[in-house]
Amino acid sequence: MQVSDTIIKQPQEKLLTDAALMQSLKEAIAQKLAPDVTNIDLKGIYPEEFLRDIGSLGAYGQGVSTEYGGTGRGVLPALKAIEIVSETCLSTGFMTWCHNACSWYLQNTDNPFLKEQILPQVATGKLLSGTGLSNPMKHFAGIEKIKIIATPCEGGYILNGTLPWVSNIGDQHLFGISAQIEGTDNYLMAIAQGGMQGLELKQDVHFIALEGTNTFRCLFRNAFISHDWVLAAPCDRYVEYIKAGFILMQVGMGLGLTQNCIDLMRRIDRTKQHVNQYLDDRPDEMEDELETLRLKSYRLAEAIGHGREIVSKEILREVIESRATASELSLRASQSLMLHAGAIGYVHGSVYDRRLRESYFVAMVTPALKHLRKVLASMS
């Protein structure tokens, strides 16, 4: 699998962080994302230009060390970037998470080729990236079997199998995968490229939301992947390095969506407060719960930092609890928003309709709410 030398050798620009990054993201969202949200939602338009633009600002390089093209600021500003994008569009917020997840995989590998040659391009958005770890995460939780087999061969592995849905990918996109090493009980993790020989990308389903996420079924048929592209083999310990950051950054999606639902409820209350006051999950009480989750997730993000360490069991438990709470708040906030809106919320394609559909994704994307509760039960 090859990546163009011209891409690898491009000079790195200085990325923004903290307040400067957040302000620049708000401006980019207002100018380039907000006008396209309806087309992203209803027509499945993929916002590639916006995704590349926020990469050049620093949306994907916060958890990446400075020596590999990032800012070295850690998971916290990455989570905040996902949160702020998700306030406007969960599809794009999800893809911001997908890309950050791939950056996180590369940040935590010991593979020098991936860290030195590929990570700087992913950290700045020159190479767009997704994550194919839904199946592996469910496998390691005892929910389903791994779907790819890796057969060792000279120089690497031959991959065969299928990943049902992988998001934010295309012919030139990168994404993480996991496979069982044939004849063993061991597993590997690696980086695949959408255009690699032996890989077919298929779009053959229509989703009720998040249509603009470039989500494909991935069919591997005798696809060769070299040792240069392997993140870890075996990958048991490596998964422990990436797990907490992978899960916690998803909380940003729930934070952003819930905040927007609250803001919309308050806007509706300007004319309907006299009747909406009798509803449950009113904006003020939702805001209090949201702020509690926000502060907790920010604290956990600071504890995780920029990786390279396995977090304590207590930190991991809090991360999983926070992710579950993000799902629950998203569902409650979007349902309350629909009830606050009334009949206008029932109009197809309205913002209220979209936020309700998006909220179910927060609760269903891996790790789904039922997955999280299963893991928490096993940790009791």
Task: Report each predicted region and the residues it spans.
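Glycine-rich beta->alpha junctions and the first turn(s) of the following alpha-helix
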Residues: 206-291
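A short core secondary-structure module
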Residues: 165-199
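Glycine-rich phosphate/cofactor-binding loops in nucleotide/flavin-utilizing enzymes
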Residues: 3, 343-380
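Glycine-rich flavin
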Residues: 38, 46-56, 60-160
